[in-house]
A protein has these predicted regions:
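A general secondary-structure boundary signal
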Residues: 10, 46, 59-61, 69-71, ...
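Extreme N-terminal segment that seeds HTH/winged-HTH DNA-binding domains in transcriptional regulators
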Residues: 1-31, 37, 85, 89, ...
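Beta-hairpin "wing" of winged helix-turn-helix
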Residues: 25-26, 30, 58-67, 71-74
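Short Asp/Glu-rich motifs
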Residues: 40, 75-76, 117-118
Length: 123
């Protein structure tokens, strides 16, 4: 993973894990790697990995079973909320950029429809 120097690394790792969860690359209830394994996987400091799990736990995305590890929540409401939150963030960024280009929302919708027709976005 390449990191953006403008955003703290732990937030980028959190977003990566959330993206894996909402795209079912990490299943609900699945055991997550240990902090050490996460640190190796993302080439981050073990303290950063621990912070990632602390924040995900605080948000209800995962939970720790003492002596067993950290697991993804099985609460579909939380997963839907994550998906909605990430979609909202993407839309806000998109709308700001569209307005900078002087394009109306209606025009943007037409551009999106046209681009979707000519592009296989499922890849």
């Amino acid at each position: 993973m390449q990191y953006d120097s403008k955003l703290p690394i732990y937030l980028q790792v959190i977003n990566s894990i959330k993206m894996d969860i909402i795209n079912n690359r990490i299943a609900c209830g699945q055991k997550l790697p240990s902090s050490r394994e996460l640190a190796v996987q993302y080439t981050i400091n073990p303290n950063t990995a621990a912070r990632v799990y602390q924040e995900l736990e605080r948000e209800g995305v995962c939970f720790t079973k003492r002596g067993m590890g950290t697991f993804v929540t099985e609460d579909e409401t939380i997963i839907r909320a994550i998906r909605s939150e990430m979609a909202d963030e993407a839309i806000v960024v998109f709308l700001k950029r569209i307005k900078e280009l002087g394009i109306s929302v209606d025009e943007a919708v037409e551009f999106i429809r046209h681009k979707e027709e000519e592009t296989d976005v499922s890849k």
